[in-house]
């Protein structure tokens, strides 16, 4: 089916320029790159861009700590980020920075248009001020309890638990992240974007098909609670763009960050000497398509503020937001101490990029589900699918073609009907790539790979090769196998760019989506070289070890005043000091399927979440009753792999056992994360 070529602009969320790229980041960039590569294969004009998010107080303070300028720090970080993305073969057409002249000009233009149209309001506000550091505190440098859901240890601009946004002054019991001091109130004039004026437009846009259903439903909750005016200014000292005609006032980082999409594209157009495309893509009535791939943690900014800013400044809105979930490793949050907080560069020191690209792709769908990188499953799947099913299909046929037929394939297909089965799958697989149902696409491709290998098994070319007078049959069978390999690799081309390059070199032809309609007949292939190597758990172990920032000593045995048990043998104070007891909030409690003794507890230690299995089910038949309670846990107990998952600590309880188990709780006033001394 012939497709009409489309003009498409694709972006990924801008990585913040104060830290390295890790495997959590890579999920989004791989997802977008696979989609972009598919679009290019179908003949569409795609511009794929990104940039570093380079402004804000965190950058300013970190540069001060390093003894360098913010400009120097973000320059070095940009080079590191670009190296990592190139290592994973992310095919960006341009990678820029929000700290650029293009972004400054566009930020000022959008601000001026919003102001001219009456959407910028000035008012004096009472703002939190750090008396020890002598500075107003940006949202992310104040932490406290969320005023909406009462979750502790939340930042001053939005809650990571319930997703609500609010002013830092609304936080309960705020603290300065910079000094730990309790902030004081000081007056300051600020500029506000009148978001409520766009409520009707945003509600219509929400239901226009521009958002996934899960996102649209979440936005409806925000509409029902009412939209608030958005503070878009920050006081000096601040690293960013100064607001025109407002000395000492700077654009809030979340105003100029999404404008960075426009700035990066403008930079690309200027590099090309193209004075037309920027307006063609960004004008109000543009027919080009604009897609933002983002994580679920920044939906609020991209689904409310960003389209409203564009609407109010006479630019086009996004065609769609493609939102994904988080990455866990081995069923738990990425952990530096366990070696599962893995940087992109560390991964590339131990594995190739295609392996992770394939694993993520096989697990992705159009939904906002979290993706678990199970390292053992990763090894098994890469070996089973890429090596055993796909690459093996080429290797088991290429030898005969090279040795017996000088690399020349047969002049006709041995099984045209089977080949047509493979090419007919292009529509289903293509639709899966298009709709971001990547896991479905991979399943369809691997089902074809099974079919291809079954054909080779049944035809047994290694047997035919030994039979006199069957050279033509041998050539036909192996040529069929190689043609099926070609179709499979064409379908996988968006996912496996490096393997594709090697396959194209062997096949002596470029792999194109439409090209598979014509099989390779009477065609000379090149001598076969190993296309892909098996991986093993030793590489995983080396990766994890390299990722560990520190190895924690095993926790000492815990003693306690259990009523019916004698006091244990005396220990030294130093022994006891090894045990790190912390106050924890029970965020969730549930039964463990397959166990009549355990409850699964989700604990909040004041910024870090832990998954703990506890044998207290007999005493707490209704686990929901535990939710919201504070308890005491051993926070530095080495994680323990259990049949049901990994337990990341131990909660403290007293009693002889059975129904007589009593979970310990701290006195009123203790907060999650407080150390028990």
Swiss-Prot record:
Annotated GO biological process: methionyl-tRNA aminoacylation
Cofactor requirements of the protein: Zn(2+)
Disulfide bond entries: none
Positions contributing to ATP binding: 336
Cofactor note: Binds 1 zinc ion per subunit.
Gene Ontology cellular-component annotations: cytosol
Signal sequence, start to end: none
CDD domains: Anticodon_Ia_Met, MetRS_core, tRNA_bind_EcMetRS_like
Residue span(s) of domain tRNA-binding: 575-677
Keyword Cytoplasm applies: yes
Reactions accelerated catalytically: tRNA(Met) + L-methionine + ATP = L-methionyl-tRNA(Met) + AMP + diphosphate
Family annotation (Gene3D superfamilies): HUPs, Isoleucyl-tRNA Synthetase, Domain 1, Methionyl-tRNA synthetase, Zn-domain, Nucleic acid-binding proteins
Motif ('HIGH' region) on chain: 15-25
The protein's name in its UniProt record: Methionine--tRNA ligase
Lineage start: Bacteria, Pseudomonadati, Pseudomonadota, Gammaproteobacteria, Enterobacterales
């Amino acid at each position: 089916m012939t497709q009409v070529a489309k003009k498409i602009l694709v972006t990924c969320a801008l990585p913040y320029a104060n830290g390295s790229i890790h495997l959590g980041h890579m999920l989004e960039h791989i997802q977008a790159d696979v989609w972009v590569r598919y679009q290019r294969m179908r003949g569409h004009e795609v511009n794929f861009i990104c940039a570093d998010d380079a402004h804000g107080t965190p950058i300013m303070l970190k540069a001060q700590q390093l003894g360098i300028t913010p400009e120097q720090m973000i320059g070095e970080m940009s080079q590191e980020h670009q190296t990592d993305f190139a290592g994973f073969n992310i095919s960006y057409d341009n990678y820029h920075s929000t700290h650029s002249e293009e972004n400054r000009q566009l930020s000022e233009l959008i601000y001026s248009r919003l102001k001219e149209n009456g959407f910028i309001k000035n008012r004096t506000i009472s703002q939190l001020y750090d008396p020890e550091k002598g500075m107003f505190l940006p949202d992310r440098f104040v932490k406290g309890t969320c005023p909406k859901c009462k979750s502790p240890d939340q930042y001053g601009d939005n809650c990571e638990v319930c997703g609500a946004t609010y002013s830092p002054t609304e936080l309960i019991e705020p603290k300065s992240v910079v000094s730990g001091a309790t902030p004081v109130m000081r007056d300051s004039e600020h500029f506000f974007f009148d978001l409520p004026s766009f409520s009707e437009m945003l509600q219509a846009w929400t239901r226009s098909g521009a958002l996934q259903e899960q996102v649209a439903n979440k936005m409806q909750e925000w509409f029902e609670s009412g939209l608030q005016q958005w503070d878009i200014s920050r006081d000096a000292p601040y690293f960013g763009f100064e607001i025109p005609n407002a000395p000492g006032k700077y654009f809030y980082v979340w105003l100029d960050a999404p404008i960075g999409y426009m700035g990066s594209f403008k930079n690309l157009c200027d590099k090309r000497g193209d004075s037309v495309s920027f307006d063609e893509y960004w004008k109000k009535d543009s027919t080009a398509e604009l897609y933002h791939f983002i994580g679920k943690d920044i939906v609020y900014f991209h689904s409310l503020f960003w389209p409203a800013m564009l609407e109010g400044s006479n630019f086009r809105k996004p065609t769609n937001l493609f939102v994904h979930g988080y990455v866990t490793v081995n069923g738990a949050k990425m952990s530096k101490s366990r070696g599962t907080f893995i940087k992109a560069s560390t991964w590339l020191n131990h594995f190739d990029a295609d392996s992770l690209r394939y694993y993520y792709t096989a697990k992705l769908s159009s939904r906002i589900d979290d993706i678990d990188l199970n390292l053992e499953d990763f090894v098994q799947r890469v070996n089973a699918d890429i090596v055993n099913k796909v690459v093996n299909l080429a290797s088991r046929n290429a030898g005969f073609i090279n040795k017996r037929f000088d690399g020349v394939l047969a002049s006709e297909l041995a099984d045209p009907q089977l080949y047509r089965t493979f090419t007919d799958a292009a529509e289903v697989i293509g639709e899966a790539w298009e709709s971001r149902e990547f896991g479905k696409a991979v399943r369809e491709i691997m089902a074809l790979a099974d079919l291809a290998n079954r054909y080779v098994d049944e035809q047994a070319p290694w047997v035919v090769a030994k039979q006199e007078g069957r050279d033509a049959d041998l050539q036909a069978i192996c040529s069929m196998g190689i043609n099926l390999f070609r179709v499979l690799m064409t379908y996988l081309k968006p996912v496996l760019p490096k393997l594709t390059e090697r396959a194209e070199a062997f096949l002596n032809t470029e792999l194109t989506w439409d090209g598979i309609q014509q099989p390779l007949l009477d065609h000379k292939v090149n001598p076969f070289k190993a296309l892909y190597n098996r991986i093993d758990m030793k590489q995983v172990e080396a990766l994890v070890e390299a990722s560990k920032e520190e190895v924690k000593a095993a926790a000492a045995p815990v003693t306690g005043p259990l009523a019916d048990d004698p006091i244990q043998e005396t220990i030294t104070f130093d022994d006891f000091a090894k045990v790190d007891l912390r106050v924890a909030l029970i965020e969730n409690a549930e039964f463990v399927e397959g166990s009549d003794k355990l409850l699964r507890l989700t604990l909040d230690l004041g910024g870090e979440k832990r998954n703990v299995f506890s044998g207290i089910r007999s005493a707490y038949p209704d686990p929901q009753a535990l939710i919201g309670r504070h308890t005491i846990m051993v926070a530095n107990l080495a994680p323990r792999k259990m049949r049901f998952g990994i337990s990341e600590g131990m909660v403290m309880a007293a009693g002889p056992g059975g129904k007589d188990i009593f979970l310990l709780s701290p006195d009123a006033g203790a907060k999650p994360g407080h150390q028990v001394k």
